[in-house]
């Protein structure tokens, strides 16, 4: 079974060092719709703008031993492919190709950035 971990990007401060588990606990996220998160309490449901983007660890490490998260930008050392990791159709995959990450060997992949701090890499 893979380890479940998250990281969070704080939009207003452009900071990736946010403790995602604390964000999740503090905000009690139920589900996401656009840029609003819907919460539930005993008094009823309400929504609010959410200032964090939460990304999940995919359970793999790159060739340097760095954890890979959705939103990371990967480079394949053999094909020179550069693309981002996304979650689609119940699996983590490479965005443009749509190929599941199982088609790539993690020892050939390197995290070179992420979509928030390094969008120019795409």
Predicted regions and their residues:
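Secondary-structure transition motif
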Residues: 1-122
């Amino acid at each position: 079974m893979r380890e479940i971990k998250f990281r969070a990007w704080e939009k207003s401060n452009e900071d990736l060092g946010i403790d995602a588990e604390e964000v999740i606990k503090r905000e009690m996220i139920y589900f996401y719709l656009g840029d609003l998160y819907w919460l539930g309490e005993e008094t009823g449901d309400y929504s609010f703008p959410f200032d964090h983007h939460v990304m999940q660890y995919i359970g793999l490490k790159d060739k340097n031993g760095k954890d890979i998260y959705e939103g990371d930008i990967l480079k394949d050392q053999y094909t020179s492919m550069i693309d981002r990791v996304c979650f689609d159709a119940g699996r983590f995959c490479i965005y443009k190709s749509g190929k599941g990450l199982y088609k790539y060997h993690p020892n050939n992949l390197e995290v070179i950035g992420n979509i928030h701090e390094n969008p120019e890499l795409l």
